[in-house]
């Protein structure tokens, strides 16, 4: 009698032997050297970084913005490197929700319109409008739909940013929080919202941060330092 072998889960992001160089007129700076990474499709994963250029390069590679490197990148089994620019943009816009410490809005538009116009290629306008209202309700800010961004508090704006990321029902959330003008309260609230989304919606989270004041529990911590990855925290 044969045993049942569980199929290997497709990784959320899978990077293999990534070599990335930043070329300028004077020299070629090594950003990544043989970088290999698998991000679990169910986990809340934290990547701690030190260098902004490494963080930016990593986000651009896993989201398909940058394919100027050697190696292989997969997103949910999709081989990013063979897709053209339009295909990569479509994959990114439909399947990844982005949330950052600094989130930009159209100040002349209300909350509803800021979210509405952020969704590309929406064919069913009625369905989209219902999705926006339901998403605002899930974040507890449905009464703010007609408010302009400049009239909202920092916490309320962050909830709007999360609503904008979630309204398209993404396969994952990529979040970035840097320690410029760091506020522990703001960071803790940012983490609280991420944890809530991960728990309530079962959406995998990838948080990339250079903050050291971490009052949180995640499934995996990875350190990005000098173009290499290490399991756990590394000083």
Q: PLM features: residue spans?
A:
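Conserved ABC transporter NBD signature motif
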Residues: 71-80
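Conserved ABC ATPase "signature" region
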Residues: 127-144
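Conserved ABC ATPase signature
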Residues: 148-156
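Hydrophobic anchor residue at the start of the ABC signature
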Residues: 161-162
């Amino acid at each position: 009698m044969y045993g049942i072998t569980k199929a290997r889960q497709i990784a959320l992001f899978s990077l293999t032997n990534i070599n990335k160089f930043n070329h300028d007129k004077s020299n070629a700076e090594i950003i990544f050297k043989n970088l290999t990474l698998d991000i679990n499709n169910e986990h809340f994963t934290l990547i701690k970084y030190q260098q902004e250029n490494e963080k930016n390069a990593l986000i651009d590679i896993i989201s398909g913005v940058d394919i100027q490197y050697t190696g292989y990148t997969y997103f949910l089994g999709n081989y990013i490197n063979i897709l053209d620019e339009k295909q990569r943009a479509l994959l990114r816009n439909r399947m990844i929700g982005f949330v950052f410490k600094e989130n930009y809005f159209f100040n002349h538009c209300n909350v509803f319109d800021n979210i509405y116009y952020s969704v590309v290629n929406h064919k069913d306008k009625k369905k989209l409008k219902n999705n926006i209202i339901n998403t605002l309700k899930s974040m507890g800010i449905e009464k703010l739909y007609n408010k302009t961004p400049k009239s909202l508090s920092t916490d309320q704006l962050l909830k709007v940013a999360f609503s904008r990321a979630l309204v398209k029902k993404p396969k994952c959330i990529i979040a970035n929080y840097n320690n410029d003008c760091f506020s522990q309260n703001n960071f803790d609230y940012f983490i609280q919202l991420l944890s809530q989304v991960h728990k309530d919606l079962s959406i995998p989270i990838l948080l990339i941060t250079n903050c050291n004041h971490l009052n949180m529990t995640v499934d995996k911590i990875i350190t990005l330092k000098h173009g290499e990855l290490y399991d756990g925290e590394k000083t």
